[in-house]
Regions:
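Structural signature of transmembrane alpha-helices in multi-pass secondary transporters
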Residues: 6, 37-45, 122, 154, ...
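Helix-loop junctions on the cytosolic side of multi-pass membrane transporters
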Residues: 19-23, 61, 65-95, 169-172, ...
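Juxtamembrane cytosolic amphipathic helices that cap and anchor the N-termini
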Residues: 97-122, 221-225
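Transmembrane alpha-helix boundary/hinge residues in polytopic small-molecule transporters
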Residues: 15-16, 20, 115, 131, ...
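C-terminal transmembrane bundle of multi-pass solute transporters/carriers
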Residues: 100, 107, 132-133, 137-323
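Cytoplasmic helix-loop-helix junction between adjacent transmembrane helices
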Residues: 2-45, 49
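A gly/Pro-rich, aromatic-decorated transmembrane alpha-helix motif that marks the paired
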Residues: 43-55, 273-282
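Small-residue-rich segments within alpha-helical transmembrane domains of MFS-like 12-TM solute carriers
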Residues: 7-15, 123-127, 234-242
Length: 323
């Protein structure tokens, strides 16, 4: 129950915070704001669990949750003291009618719609996280430590891409940039799959030393390549996210931004779950290496076709944003 309430609250908070950004900042600073959000997300995924682990080990769960309560209370007090924003034009009372209007608007907004579609493609065919325990147990070795390294590598990539994203503000062809970033993402997914394939073939034919569930028994070369692939996935996904978020925030009118941001949240949350199903099914039916290899190829191929077919998306210019 608490986890469900926390997830619902986080979704509402994220949607609202993203939707108000263009009303607080001039248009040229929106990409920087999206990058700053990526830095925040990267810090949360890297430092947050580490700090929680230290607190749990030193003072226990009770005091750790108390620290969490204090931090959330401080954040809440900061929010309630903010000045009230003027009501945006064209905003209606929330309800099913409002949701339907958002969906109807999306049908006639090819650029925003395509930004959702390409993200679904990337997240469906390029989310190898459910493979990590199996990789740590018998392919790369290293057990739980390997799982942690591969998971953290993507968050580090997200953080670094956001930290050094200054040149992003000088790019105006956002649709083309999104397509290229996701293509690079697919390349890193393919690299991870080929690494797993190489290890499985090597282990089966005695070409590489056996690995184990303890970290000293890890294959260091395979772990390094896999971690590099995950870091690259995090970085390229964050670059894509910066451009996609900026397109949504700048091209959508005030009255529709919140509703579209809600749909965007559903895409971001739902795509990875479909991806987990895809990875799990094909890893079970074929082999561990198959879903990331096929996924990387599918991502690269589909993105090339989609960007070529949707000419308005390819030609999208941030200086004249159109939905």
């Amino acid at each position: 129950m608490l986890a469900t309430l926390g997830s619902v609250a986080a979704t509402v908070q994220m949607t609202t915070r993203s939707a108000v950004t263009p009303r607080l900042l001039p248009g040229e600073l929106v990409p920087a704001a999206s990058a700053l959000n990526g830095i925040s997300f990267g810090v949360q995924l890297t430092l947050g669990p580490a700090l929680a682990g230290v607190l749990v080990a030193s003072v226990g769960f009770g005091w750790t949750y108390l620290v969490d309560v204090v931090l959330f209370t401080t954040m809440f007090l900061g929010i309630v003291t903010l000045p009230k924003m003027a009501k945006a034009e064209g905003v209606e009372r929330p309800g099913w009618k409002s949701l339907k209007q958002g969906i109807d608007f999306l049908r006639n907004a090819p650029n925003i719609r395509m930004s959702f579609i390409v993200d679904i493609v990337a997240m469906t065919f390029g989310r190898p996280h459910v493979l990590f325990p199996a990789l740590g147990a018998g392919v790369i070795g290293g057990g739980a430590v390997t799982v942690g390294i591969l998971t953290a590598a993507m968050a580090v990539g997200t953080f670094l891409a956001s930290l050094f994203s200054g040149p992003v503000g000088h790019v105006h062809r956002h649709g083309l940039a999104v397509g290229r970033a996701i293509t690079v993402y697919g390349g890193f997914v393919l690299l991870l799959g080929l690494t797993v394939l190489g290890m499985q073939v090597g282990l089966a034919n005695g070409l590489v030393a056996d690995v184990g569930k303890t970290f000293p028994d890890v294959n260091w070369i395979a772990l390094g390549v896999a971690a590099f692939a995950m870091l690259g996935m995090g970085a390229s996904d964050e670059i894509s996210a910066i451009f996609r978020s900026t397109m949504l925030l700048m091209a959508a009118p005030d009255g529709m931004r919140g509703r579209l941001q809600g749909i965007f949240t559903v895409v971001v949350a739902g795509g990875p779950r479909i991806g987990d199903l895809y990875i799990g099914v094909f890893a079970t039916l074929v082999a561990l290496w198959f879903p990331p290899v096929l996924g990387g190829i599918v991502i690269i191929g589909l993105i090339a076709v989609l960007v070529r077919v949707q000419r308005t998306f390819r030609a999208y210019d941030a200086r004249t944003p159109t939905p």
